[in-house]
Curated annotation (Swiss-Prot):
Annotated spans, Disordered: 40-207
Residue ranges, annotated region (G1): 309-316
GO cellular component, one term: cytosol
Annotated residues for binding of GTP: 309-316, 355-359, 409-412
G3, as annotated region: 355-358
Lineage: Bacteria, Bacillati, Bacillota, Bacilli, Lactobacillales
UniProt-annotated stretches for the region G4: 409-412
Function per UniProt: One of the essential components for the initiation of protein synthesis. Protects formylmethionyl-tRNA from spontaneous hydrolysis and promotes its binding to the 30S ribosomal subunits. Also involved in the hydrolysis of GTP during the formation of the 70S ribosomal complex.
Record-annotated disulphide pairs: none
Region spans: G5: 445-447
Biased composition (Low complexity): 57-186
HAMAP family reported for this sequence: IF_2_B
Protein name in UniProt: Translation initiation factor IF-2
Family from the record: Belongs to the TRAFAC class translation factor GTPase superfamily. Classic translation factor GTPase family. IF-2 subfamily.
Organism from which the protein derives: Enterococcus faecalis (strain ATCC 700802 / V583)
């Protein structure tokens, strides 16, 4: 027999489903609710618990007989329905060979249609009496099946008008209702023609949602909504909304909650509220803090050495000698155009070298090289001595607090004087060790490989003293040495790893760009899969070209790296837009004040050299007190992108004489907000500049009387002051104008109006012939017939 549900058993025993469920729990049965299914043994226990055990035995017996008859007589289910009426009457005296299921269906049809059949009333009476005695779940027993043969026959004979069992008790037989429910439950086993129209079996009950315990701590961020909190504490949003409603807070599941509400809700649930600190993923500088390094994982790393000095003093030649390669031959004109990063192995000890340009235009690149280095080699030519870029390199190294090794180069040349170099450098606090100082001096010849080993020994000695260490196990961080856009590879960046190990495939944020390391190439042009601390590598895979000097950080996943890179690019764009606007002839007065000294930066471009010189000389002759003209650049030719870049960097105005800007320069000028003025006549250009420069002078003001009014009445109001009822006798009085109180021709007070009203309404201006009420700031000693004079200060144009 199939399992029975709790609500069916409760209906049979005239008990509430809840009582049966509770009794089942007491007996240790795993029942969730009234839809739970129980076995026949569990049903027996429940009936015995409610005092009805004998009925269960009869039911079980009937159930067994029913199963046997169903198995033996399955083909007989269809045969009686096809018999002729005469055969059906003969079948009434035949022993009952029909299955219980077939009889149940026929009896069900009789009960459902409710038509009378007087031929079988006596048999129905016997059946009903027997049903009341047995009251089993199927509504019939084996004896009942024997005595109800005539019912079957009568039913088959009268299929057009089916008969109804009469219940002498005054209502429909309860057993027949149970029989109807049981038939519906077992009909899915029925095969044959009528099985198509039978009802589907009841689906199993959906298991109840598993109860999950509340967490001990609610980690929240301010602004979380109800739906987010519901997921964290494993509760329905409706439950949280109801609880908040009981606390007096009306919200929906998508409404953001403040910090206090979230904490009160957590306390009400018995959890400890803990605010989660929001981490700014776009802030990559925090990865470079010393606290982020784990001391236990530190290992010795190679030193980073920067070669600095004046142009053409032999820096690249020295590195060329160290690398045994011809780096100089590949440079334009033999002058280093960008920072080169190389790693050399000296007796099993690697050293990373950075070669910086010595030209005057590369100041920022030298400063960047000094900021990421451990040791600075200052190359000075013995025949040339200390030069401007030499002094600049010294200042960069001192600012970065980096030890300096002085390499006196070109000692092989005639006229070389290393002692003179030492004398000059001692004036800049670089005193040789033999003179009692702490600076190492090495006399070398990079061209002929003289004393190079001594220089390398001193580098390794200082590196050992400095005890340089790094953590190779963490995510890689470092600095961009240089970057470019390659036609075949796309954005290419040369990186110097400072901490951690960089791998191929790592998600990376470089400055305001992001991407994944696709190809990693070392300084020898070979592909590597990883790069440790103090190792320079060239990578591809970025979405844009970063700026030299930008920092890079490796992230856990590409999604986070993309978010950080996009956020950094967005912030950089907003910062650029919010920066102060460029100088134009229209805003010179507001934007070019430098204390007492003011100057206008101008770039002059002309069609011929003579015109450029003439315009420059004429502009410099403009004599306006306190303002001077500075010619940043003067040249011949069209206004190009370089001119716009220079103007943006120097905050200058471009004057074009008989020339036009190129389309690229015009577009860049719009982006950089650089002011370009084009002229064909010299004196008009001079006049325009002179007019703008006059606007830079401190303005002079003169007083202008706007009107006068007479005091006719006084109203003294406590805690407010004296209100004067006035009549305008001349001109007009403005709310923002200055006023003088004149009594008997003598000015007794000068100040500003506190309020000006007409008919209790604040007004900006009262004209001639109108009355008004006025109050003067910090002055209440007004009298009737006092004159109040209004005035404003106007700027005098120069």
């Amino acid at each position: 027999m199939g399992k029975k549900r709790i609500y069916e058993l409760a209906k049979e025993m005239n008990k509430a489903s809840k009582d049966v469920v509770d009794k089942a729990h007491q007996l240790g049965m795993d029942v969730k609710n009234h839809m739970g299914a129980i076995s026949s043994e569990q049903e027996t226990k429940l009936r015995q618990a409610f005092g009805g055990g004998s009925t269960v035995n009869t039911q079980s017996k009937a159930t067994n007989n029913q199963k046997q008859q169903t198995t033996q007589n399955k083909p007989a289910n269809k045969k009686p329905m096809n018999n002729k009426p005469g055969e059906q009457r003969n079948n009434q005296n035949r022993p009952n060979n029909q299955s219980t299921n077939g009889q149940q269906r026929n009896n069900n049809n009789q009960n459902r249609h409710g038509q009378s059949n007087t031929q079988n009333r006596s048999n129905q009476t016997n059946t009903n009496n027997q049903n009341r005695n047995t009251q089993n779940n199927n509504g019939s027993t084996t004896n009942q099946n024997r005595t109800s043969q005539n019912n079957n026959g009568g039913n088959n004979q009268n299929r057009g008008g089916q008969n109804r069992n009469n219940n002498f008790g005054g209502g429909q037989n309860r057993n027949n209702r149970n029989n109807f429910n049981n038939q519906n439950r077992n009909r899915f086993n029925k095969k044959g023609k009528k099985g198509k129209h039978q009802q589907e079996s009841a689906k199993p009950a959906v298991p109840a949602r598993k109860f999950r315990e509340l967490p001990d701590v609610l980690e929240y961020t301010e602004g979380m909504n109800v739906a987010d909190i519901a997921k964290k504490i494993h509760r329905e949003p409706a439950e949280i909304i109801k609880k908040l409603f009981m606390m007096g807070v009306m919200v929906n599941q998508n409404q953001a909650l403040d910090k206090d509400t979230i904490e009160l809700l957590a306390v009400d649930y018995g959890m400890e509220p803990q605010e989660k600190v929001q981490v700014d993923i776009a802030d990559i500088d925090k990865f470079f803090e010393p606290e982020a390094v784990v001391e236990e994982n530190l290992t010795t790393r190679p030193p980073v050495v920067t070669i600095m000095g004046h142009v053409d003093h032999g820096k690249t030649t020295l590195l060329d000698t160290l690398r045994h390669s011809r780096v100089t031959s590949g440079e334009a004109g033999g002058i280093t155009q960008h920072i080169g990063a190389y790693q050399l192995d000296i007796d099993g000890k690697p050293i990373t070298f950075l070669d910086t340009p010595g030209h005057a235009a590369f100041t920022s690149m030298r400063a960047r090289g000094a900021s990421i280095t451990d040791i600075t080699i200052l190359v000075v030519a013995a025949d040339d001595g200390v030069m401007p870029q030499t002094i600049e390199a010294i200042n960069h190294a001192k600012a970065a607090k980096v030890p300096i090794i002085v390499a006196v180069n070109k000692i092989d040349k005639p006229g070389a004087n290393p002692d003179h170099v030492k004398q000059e450098l001692s004036e800049h606090e670089l005193i040789p060790e033999e003179w009692g100082g702490d600076t190492i001096f090495v006399n070398i010849s990079a061209k002929f490989n003289q004393n190079i080993d001594e220089l390398l020994e001193n580098i390794l000695l200082i590196a050992e003293v400095e005890d340089l260490k790094a953590d190779p196990t963490q995510k890689a961080i470092g600095t961009v040495i240089e970057a470019r856009l390659d036609k075949g590879k796309g954005p290419v960046a040369t990186l110097l790893v400072q901490q951690g190990t960089l791998h191929v495939g790592d998600p990376i944020v470089v400055g305001n760009t992001y991407g994944r390391v696709r190809v990693m190439t070392n300084d020898m042009g070979r592909r590597d899969k990883e790069a440790g601390p103090a190792t320079p590598v060239e990578i591809t895979g970025l979405n844009d070209v970063p700026q030299a000097g930008d920092r890079f950080v490796v992230f856990e996943d590409e999604k986070t790296a993309r978010q950080a890179g996009e956020e950094r690019a967005k912030r950089a764009l907003l910062e650029q837009r919010s920066a102060s606007s460029r100088v134009t002839l229209d805003n010179l007065f507001e934007s070019l004040k430098e204390g007492e000294l003011k100057e206008v930066n101008i770039i002059v471009k002309a069609d011929v050299q003579g015109s450029a010189e003439a315009v420059s000389a004429s502009l410099q002759k403009i004599d306006v007190e306190g303002v001077r003209v500075k010619i940043v650049h003067a040249a011949v030719g069209a206004i190009n992108e370089s001119d716009v870049t220079l103007a943006a960097a120097s905050n200058a105005i471009i004057i074009g004489f008989n020339v036009r800007p190129t389309p690229q320069a015009k577009q860049q000028a719009e982006q950089e907000e650089v002011d370009i003025r084009l002229h064909r006549i010299i004196y008009k250009a001079l006049e325009e500049i002179e007019t703008a420069m006059k606007g830079l002078l401190d303005p002079e003001f003169e007083e202008k009387i706007t009107g006068q009014m007479t005091v006719r009445e006084l109203y003294k109001v406590s805690k407010v002051g004296t209100i004067a009822g006035c009549y305008v006798t001349e001109g007009f009085i403005r709310r923002d104008s200055g006023v003088r109180v004149i009594r008997d021709g003598i000015v007794i007070y000068e100040g500003k109006l506190a309020s000006l009203k007409r008919f209790k309404d604040d007004v900006k201006e009262v004209k001639l012939g109108f009355e008004c009420g006025a109050m003067i700031e910090n002055f209440n000693d007004l009298r009737v017939d006092d004159a109040i004079e209004g005035f404003i200060m106007e700027e005098i144009k120069q």
